[in-house]
Amino acid sequence: MDVVILAAGLGTRMKSSKPKVLHRILEKPIIDYVIDCAKSLNPFNSFVVINPSLKEVAEHLEKYNIKIVFQDEPKGTAHALLSALPYLSSDKILILNGDTPLLRKETLDSFIELFNKNGLDMALLSFYPQREHSYGRILRDGEQKIKKIVEITDFKDELMLSSEANSGIYILKREVAELVKEIKQNPNKGEFYLTDIVEIAVNKGFNIEAYPLAEENELIGINTRAELSLAMRYLRDRIVKGWMEKGITFYDPALVWISPSVTIGQDTIIYPNVFLEGDTKIGQNCLICQGVRIKNSIIEDNVQINDCTVIENSHIKSASKIGPFAHLRPDSIIGKGCRIGNFVEVKNSTIGDGTKAAHLSYIGDSEIGNNVNIGAGTITCNYDGQKKHKTIIEDNVFIGSDTQLVAPVKICKGAYIGAGSTITKEVPEDSLAISRTPQKNILGWAKKKRKQ
């Protein structure tokens, strides 16, 4: 079986400089969903038909082992298939649309099985719409045999005769596909409609059937920003439902966004307004609170992420507590049982087990050991105006509040840093470092000031 994905439309209704099929749904381009679904069927060949002006699409498709066919002129879906026909080598052809990203492999498996089982020459995937749409309708005769497909723009009166809509997804034999050469130009739009192949094939005695195997939401085609938003919500609902069936609790399923590549462990609880993106992996029995965004990160078991925390390309080990209002920037590793508290920013740093930075700190380009206490207001001064430098803090160090550690610098294990210090040199093991100006009390000064 060959698969042909029709993606030559210019997508003018999207009002965008970006090609329609490259717009993203939960971080993934629309056409990637279709290609991945097609590839899961293990076809003999896969083709994508695009307009030559869509150079961005052609460049995007280079990462796939897929053949590109150019439709030199935008003359409609029939002309798009005609452009691909010389390159097809299989007796069966599955036709998909590049703007229908929610189609599932299970649906196509059933569709292909029915086509083969019933010895058909062509099959259509149909559905019964519940909302207003622009899909053509499938007309049947008194014996419920298919007669033709009528487009909503051309035959509005006839549409009252049928509520069965055409999804634009077909499987057909090569000899039926050849009939695309007989399709006439539509007088209203000047295009060649692939839907007209049905009436031609019926009149020639080919065996054709339509199967309503999918819900309307699965077959949504994206032509506008409103439909893009709708598809995002449908996919979100599908993903969240799947995770609930696997033992995840969502306080409000309609207010979370989870990318398809994310994984979540059992008994994790997720609050509203949470975004889990990229290749994020959440362990078991975690708590993800309101307003959290996690991207391309590993969160191990029993971790608590408190409100309004952002985590990017980082690794948090088990039983740690992060936030609220914390920011873990890329390449940060947080050890087991750590506490990274409110308004703490960590960047490109490794923090050992049991270490606490509870308030108002910046930790950048640092290597921090186990059981370290980092006082409120501590800053690793890692940038000298030209390049970044490393701070090393060994095990069991106590850093007092409002400390500046001017990198490169090392604090050896067991050392104490007095509050308000600026540390520029190595601090030896088990010693106290303090660099603040000695306190001076001027007796009676305030009383004199008030009398002035």
Curated annotation (Swiss-Prot):
Coarse class of the protein's main subcellular location: cytoplasm
Residues binding UDP-N-acetyl-alpha-D-glucosamine: 6-9, 20, 71, 76-77, 136, 151, 166, 223, 329, 347, 362, 373
Cofactor note: Binds 1 Mg(2+) ion per subunit.
Location of the region described as Pyrophosphorylase in the Swiss-Prot/TrEMBL record: 1-225
Keyword vocabulary terms for this entry: Acyltransferase, Cell shape, Cell wall biogenesis/degradation, Cytoplasm, Magnesium, Metal-binding, Multifunctional enzyme, Nucleotidyltransferase, Peptidoglycan synthesis, Repeat, Transferase
Broad EC category: transferase
InterPro entries reported in the protein's UniProt record: Bifunctional_GlmU (IPR005882), GlmU-like (IPR050065), GlmU_C_LbH (IPR038009), Hexapep (IPR001451), MobA-like_NTP_Trfase (IPR025877), Nucleotide-diphossugar_trans (IPR029044), Trimer_LpxA-like_sf (IPR011004)
Annotated GO CC locations: cytoplasm; membrane
GO biological process: cell morphogenesis; cell wall organization; lipid A biosynthetic process; peptidoglycan biosynthetic process; regulation of cell shape; UDP-N-acetylglucosamine biosynthetic process
Pathway annotation: Nucleotide-sugar biosynthesis; UDP-N-acetyl-alpha-D-glucosamine biosynthesis; N-acetyl-alpha-D-glucosamine 1-phosphate from alpha-D-glucosamine 6-phosphate (route II): step 2/2; Nucleotide-sugar biosynthesis; UDP-N-acetyl-alpha-D-glucosamine biosynthesis; UDP-N-acetyl-alpha-D-glucosamine from N-acetyl-alpha-D-glucosamine 1-phosphate: step 1/1; Bacterial outer membrane biogenesis; LPS lipid A biosynthesis
N-acetyltransferase as annotated region, ranges: 247-452
Keyword Magnesium part of the UniProt annotation: yes
GO molecular function per UniProt: glucosamine-1-phosphate N-acetyltransferase activity; magnesium ion binding; UDP-N-acetylglucosamine diphosphorylase activity
CDD domains on file: GT2_GlmU_N_bac, LbH_GlmU_C
Cofactor list: Mg(2+)
Reactions accelerated catalytically: alpha-D-glucosamine 1-phosphate + acetyl-CoA = N-acetyl-alpha-D-glucosamine 1-phosphate + CoA + H(+); N-acetyl-alpha-D-glucosamine 1-phosphate + UTP + H(+) = UDP-N-acetyl-alpha-D-glucosamine + diphosphate
Quaternary structure note: Homotrimer.
Record-linked HAMAP family: GlmU
Name of this protein: Bifunctional protein GlmU
Organism, as annotated: Thermodesulfovibrio yellowstonii (strain ATCC 51303 / DSM 11347 / YP87)
Lineage: Bacteria, Pseudomonadati, Nitrospirota, Thermodesulfovibrionia, Thermodesulfovibrionales
